[in-house]
From Swiss-Prot:
GO CC field: bacterial nucleoid; cytoplasm
Main location group: cytoplasm
Family: Belongs to the RdgC family.
Subcellular location: Cytoplasm, Nucleoid
Domain of life: Bacteria
Gene name as annotated: rdgC
NCBIfam families the UniProt entry points to: PRK00321.1-3, PRK00321.1-5
Free-text function comment from the UniProt entry: May be involved in recombination.
UniProt KW Cytoplasm keyword: yes
Protein name as it appears in the record: Recombination-associated protein RdgC
Keywords recorded for this protein, A-Z: Cytoplasm, DNA recombination
PANTHER family in alphabetical order: RECOMBINATION-ASSOCIATED PROTEIN RDGC
Length: 305
């Protein structure tokens, strides 16, 4: 279980529930598949999948949860085709115009008819609570998926106050300075990919498999373009992309880290999961600290709001 994307949130209050208590709170919201007329459903599943039954997996102050979502696949083009056919039938058979309001009613009826026959797709979003650092780390590339998990967590727990982890210095400013000044924080190396944006006209230039210190890249920065995505390597152990929202994407754990999990022989899938989780969380905890420091520390919360 190696996270590939990170969206990180600060808990504004300590998380007081034990893993056992959290399991009991999540259990009533266990995932159930979509019924015939449900467009989508979400609920909690064991992080260990079929190898576990608990809705949490905890180790060393880190508590992992897994939120599963299922939705019916009902392409808008299919609904539109059925609607146009129905409207044409009414116009021909009854020799009258179909109003906008009636079209909306017909559309709802068509969706109601098609839903039971629709295929489904599902995804599982993993996250863990770092009780020591008061963080929620979500394995999600999109903010929407992370927000869905947090909304479900609030529904189960009752209250889960948190805010995005924002650094003091704006990420585009820091990332641009790395290339402009040809310097980067200790423990970090530049990768070979970045995305530059022109604030005035929105023009975007994407650089891949390229030396980011090259004159060609610097010339774009000298014209006023800023970096809103950049590839870095943390302590030769993790490759990642940092974006302008301080979200981390396309994480790749190098062998130097993965070998730590493989060095202790696991006798079961559950033990292997536990070892990987323990190592991953320790490494990510330190990486997050280093990256926050590289961007000037954590933004101070406004306690007046």
């Amino acid at each position: 279980m190696w996270f590939k994307n990170l969206r990180i949130y600060r808990l504004t209050q300590p998380f007081e529930h034990s893993p056992e208590q959290l399991h009991d709170l999540l259990a009533p919201f266990e995932f159930q598949p979509c019924g015939k007329l449900d467009p989508q459903r979400g609920g909690w599943v064991p992080p260990l999948g079929r190898h576990g039954s608990e809705f949490v997996h905890a180790a060393n102050g880190y508590i992992m949860v897994a939120f599963k979502q299922e939705e019916k696949i009902l392409p808008s083009a299919v609904v539109k085709d059925h609607l146009e056919q129905k409207v044409a039938e009414i116009s021909e058979q009854e020799a009258r115009h179909v109003s906008r309001k009636e079209r909306e009613t017909l559309k709802d009826e068509i969706i109601f008819t098609l839903l039971p026959k629709a295929f489904t797709k599902s995804n599982i979003c993993f996250a863990y609570i770092d009780t020591n650092e008061k963080l929620l780390v979500v394995n999600a590339s999109s903010a929407k998926r992370a927000e869905d998990l947090m909304a479900a967590l609030r529904e189960a727990v009752g209250s889960f106050p948190c805010v995005p982890l924002n650094p003091t210095q704006p990420p585009p400013s820091v990332m641009t300075s790395w290339l402009r000044d040809n310097t980067i924080s200790a423990g970090l190396e530049l990768g070979e990919e970045c995305e530059l944006t022109a604030p005035k006209d929105g023009r975007i230039i994407r650089c891949k498999n390229q030396d980011l210190t090259a004159d060609e890249v610097l010339s774009h920065i000298n014209t006023g373009m800023v970096v809103n995505k950049i590839a870095v390597i943390w302590k030769e152990g993790v490759q990642l992309i940092i974006d302008d929202q301080f979200a981390f994407k396309r994480l790749k754990f190098e062998e130097i880290i993965q070998e730590k999990a493989q060095s202790s022989n696991a006798d079961s899938m559950a033990e292997e999961f536990d070892q990987e989780f323990a190592i991953m969380t320790v490494e990510l905890s330190q990486m997050i600290k280093d990256l926050v420091k590289a961007f000037g520390g954590i933004e101070t919360l406004d306690t007046n709001n």
